[in-house]
């Protein structure tokens, strides 16, 4: 019995610790979002990083506390040395925040529209208008048509990075508010979600910080 136990212990395979072989990579936002490090991620091989999505709040990205409810998503689409370069792929707004904005005796008008930017990016945009008082159906229809028109025009007239900035920082919402309040009293406008459906004329953005890090590694 003792011999059998000894043989069993001797023949047992030792599991390889793959975690120790992983390399940590810095995750950078695109240059249009500051080119900052937003986190780190491990991988056995650089190719394993491609397509990984990182999330960060817009508050942490811009240092604006009022943007705490917005989450930004960036996908790795290139690796330079130990640095992962990303592309913006969408944003959303927390459910808790959206629910807190809805009140009784107000109307909620939703719009979902696919638009294309000047440089060929196709983006799905979800917008919300809250009226100050309850609106009739024909008012809702008029506002919805105007919302779609404004979002489409702003996308068609601007490059992708500029349009994304206008979506998440309030430019698109402000334009909708100023135009639609002429039609009916409004309380709030939110561009609460976006998703990049097709990428256009994108150039891989190696940030200055990432380039410096790579050059430093090459000198060592």
Swiss-Prot record:
Q: Which GO terms describe its biological process?
A: translation
Protein name, please? Small ribosomal subunit protein eS1
The cross-references to InterPro entries, in alphabetical order and at most eight, read: Ribosomal_eS1, Ribosomal_eS1_arc, Ribosomal_eS1_CS
Q: Which GO terms describe its molecular function?
A: structural constituent of ribosome
Query: What SMART domains does this protein map onto?
Result: Ribosomal_S3Ae
Q: What does the sequence similarity comment in the record state about its family?
A: Belongs to the eukaryotic ribosomal protein eS1 family.
Q: Which PANTHER family match?
A: 40S RIBOSOMAL PROTEIN S3A
Task: State the UniProt keywords alphabetically.
Answer: Ribonucleoprotein, Ribosomal protein
Q: Which domain of life is it from?
A: Archaea
Pfam families associated with the record: Ribosomal_S3Ae
Task: Output the Gene Ontology cellular-component terms.
Answer: ribonucleoprotein complex; ribosome
